[in-house]
From Swiss-Prot:
Protein family membership: Belongs to the TRAFAC class TrmE-Era-EngA-EngB-Septin-like GTPase superfamily. EngB GTPase family.
Encoding gene per record: engB
Residues engaged in binding Mg(2+): 40, 62
Full protein name: Probable GTP-binding protein EngB
Key words, A-Z: Cell cycle, Cell division, GTP-binding, Magnesium, Metal-binding, Nucleotide-binding, Septation
One GO BP annotation of this record: division septum assembly
Annotated binding of GTP, by residue: 33-40, 60-64, 79-82, 146-149, 177-179
Record has Membrane as a keyword: no
Length: 197
């Protein structure tokens, strides 16, 4: 299946404003998180590709919502601009934030948001603000702890427990992922494809 996945993923385009958002004809799964948390890398891992998702050379410099078509547009992957750090001006950063909020609230074909948290630092206030905003707006999401190979098991357990306690929602799955741990990737991939049906 992995070989098939790579060949049927294609970049559609990047939307930099509300008017350029594509139609809502296909289910969409979005990926969100702080800048440099590894969104594009996770997307590439899930679809078994090294370069399907575009990676910015500078963290915080992705200024558009990137859409990727899967299986001839049977569903789409959506890579949201990172929050928390930006090489844009304050005015531009506000525009991107407004675009993200508009997309998440009004997108009727959005099935799930995967929120990525860097295991090296755990939940930061900006992550909590974003997750709380999702909860307040009744937007379904899962959490993925990234870069777990960069922390020891004790620290990872503490971060996982803290995240579970803070989210306090049995319907929110919390996953752990590392490019070095294959079975972790498989679990997240299975969860990911569950929402494409």
């Amino acid at each position: 299946m992995a070989k098939q996945i790579t060949s049927i993923c294609s970049f559609i385009f990047g939307a930099s404003d509300k008017k350029s958002l594509p139609d809502e004809s296909a289910p969409e799964i979005a990926f969100a998180g702080r800048s440099n948390v590894g969104k594009s890398s996770l997307i590439n891992l899930l679809i078994n590709s090294k370069k399907a998702a575009r990676v910015s050379s500078k963290p915080g410099c992705t200024r558009q919502i990137n859409f990727y078509s899967m299986y001839n547009d049977k569903f789409r992957i959506v890579d949201l601009p990172g929050y928390g750090y930006s090489c844009a001006s304050k005015e531009e950063a506000v525009q991107y934030l407004n675009l993200i909020e508009y997309y998440l609230i009004h997108r009727r074909n959005l099935k799930r948001v995967f929120v990525l948290i860097d295991s090296k630092v755990g939940l930061k206030e900006i992550d909590k603000d974003f997750v709380y905003w999702l909860i307040c707006n009744n937007i379904n999401f899962n959490i993925v702890l990234t870069k777990i190979d960069k922390v020891n098991q004790e620290s990872l357990n503490a971060i996982l427990e803290n995240t579970q306690k803070w989210v306090n929602n049995e319907h929110v799955s919390i996953h752990q992922i590392s490019i070095r741990v294959k079975h972790k990737i498989t679990k997240v991939r299975d969860e990911f494809f569950k929402f494409t049906r």
